[in-house]
Curated annotation (Swiss-Prot):
InterPro entries: Cyt_b/b6_C (IPR005798), Cyt_b/b6_C_sf (IPR036150), Cyt_b/b6_N (IPR005797), Cytb/b6-like_sf (IPR027387), Cytochrome_b (IPR030689), Cytochrome_b_C_euk/bac (IPR048260), Cytochrome_b_N_euk/bac (IPR048259), Di-haem_cyt_TM (IPR016174)
Residues passing through the membrane, by range: 33-53, 77-98, 113-133, 178-198, 226-246, 288-308, 320-340, 347-367
Gene3D superfamilies: Cytochrome Bc1 Complex, Chain C
Cofactors: heme b
Species: Ochotona rufescens
Cellular compartment(s): Mitochondrion inner membrane
Protein name: Cytochrome b
PROSITE patterns: CYTB_CTER, CYTB_NTER
Pfam family of the protein (one): Cytochrom_B_C
GO cellular component terms attached to this protein's record: mitochondrial inner membrane; respiratory chain complex III
GO MF annotations in UniProt: metal ion binding; ubiquinol-cytochrome-c reductase activity
Remarks, miscellaneous: Heme 1 (or BL or b562) is low-potential and absorbs at about 562 nm, and heme 2 (or BH or b566) is high-potential and absorbs at about 566 nm.
Length: 379
């Protein structure tokens, strides 16, 4: 008798995705981050439900409702900090997942890659709106500054900002709609994840060598179902260590002060995972130019398949490209640091140089060095 997992309409889908899925035999721990992102999304949705039961999206009570969750709700503090620090874990896994895609040339699967970029934008939008909800000082001023960037759009900018705000400033209407969007976006993210996986399973996974591995495939279960839980264990251990020992390590002290439109914080900045893009935005003196650079800092990923000039897919056997890749990583860390610094000398010039290096590396140096490596293959 044929196994039910191979015949039942629903079980068949799960079987082809998680059990009998042909996977390359040589994929490393860098391929774990997809499932870790799934785990992060699950943690975020579950903790979000518990928080949404007690949170009120009103400017008068939002801050005190978050305080109430931490003080009066049974284990509310751990749920709140699991959600806040879970977002940080989510972005760490996202950045490593994207970095792995760049290093090993996974962007050549253009449909999967482009859906991934949409996912990145959706998760960033979700995280930004979530940061506004506690209605602390940084929530309010972060929302004001970031939404105000849309006013740089010619002709419709000012009307667009007021339409998003629901008035002439960030107020109750803004908070209510941000809560609604923050609630619905993770489900859109989950739907996009399904499309992402659908396109991935059309082509099969890439592997560290970048060479087609159809001749050497192994079933996902048991070989990789036994490897994935190790990543889960490490991620949850790291998250719980952060939550139980230093829950406010990655937050901003200003967000423990209730929002006050009459008092501007000395230094407005977003969460740490947006600082690299924020530094690029600030490095350009022109408002519209800054906004375009901000969008391009993420949208540049869509150009990766077009900028791939190498005859080899992966960077595994390309030492010059490897060097440039790690310079890019160092540059992004530098931008993250600069984004958290005040706008003064020497941080302004460092930010401008780091922003220039970021775009110059991706648009110019990496494609040229790939062509040089092609020539070296003939030696």
């Amino acid at each position: 008798m044929t196994n039910i997992r191979k015949t039942h309409p629903l079980m068949k889908i799960i079987n082809h995705s998680l059990i009998d899925l042909p996977a390359p035999s040589n994929i490393s721990a860098w391929w774990n981050f997809g499932s870790l992102l799934g785990l992060c999304l699950g943690i975020q949705i579950i903790t979000a439900y518990s928080l949404a039961m007690h949170y009120t999206s009103d400017t008068l009570t939002a801050f005190s409702s978050v305080t109430h969750i931490c003080r009066d709700v049974n284990y509310g503090w751990i749920i709140r900090y699991m959600h806040a620090n879970g977002a940080s874990m989510f972005f760490i896994c996202l950045f490593l997942h994207v970095g792995r895609g760049i290093y090993y040339g996974s962007y050549t699967y253009s449909e999967t890659w482009n859906i991934g970029i949409l996912l990145l934008f959706a998760v960033m939008a979700t995280a930004f709106m979530g940061y506004v909800l506690p209605w602390g000082q940084m929530s309010f001023w972060g929302a004001t500054v970031i939404t105000n960037l849309l006013s740089a759009i010619p002709y419709i900018g000012t009307d667009l900002v007021q339409w998003i705000w629901g008035g002439f400033s960030v107020d109750k209407a803004t908070l209510t709609r941000f809560f609604a969007f923050h609630f619905i976006l993770p489900f859109i993210v989950a739907a996009l994840v399904m499309v992402h996986l659908l396109f991935l399973h059309e082509t099969g996974s890439n592997n560290p060598t970048g060479i087609i591995s159809d001749a050497d495939k192994i079933p996902f279960h048991p070989y990789y179902t036994i490897k994935e839980p190790l990543g889960f264990l490490l991620l949850i251990s790291l998250l719980l260590t952060l939550v139980l020992f230093s829950p406010d390590l990655l937050g901003d002290p200003d967000n423990y002060t209730p929002a006050n439109p009459l008092s501007t914080p000395p230094h407005i900045k977003p969460e740490w995972y947006f600082l690299f893009a924020y530094a690029i935005l600030r490095s350009i003196p022109n408002k519209l130019g800054g906004v375009l650079a901000l969008v391009l800092s993420i949208a540049i990923l869509a150009a990766m398949p077009l900028l791939h000039t190498s005859k080899q897919r992966s960077m595994m056997f390309r030492p010059i490209s490897q060097t440039l890749f790690w310079i890019l990583v160092a540059d992004l860390l530098n931008l993250t640091w600069i984004g958290g610094q005040p706008v003064e000398h020497p941080f302004i010039i460092i930010g401008q140089l780091a922003s220039f290096i970021y775009f110059f590396l991706i648009f110019v140096l990496m494609p040229i060095c790939s062509l040089i490596e092609n020539k070296l293959l003939k030696w």
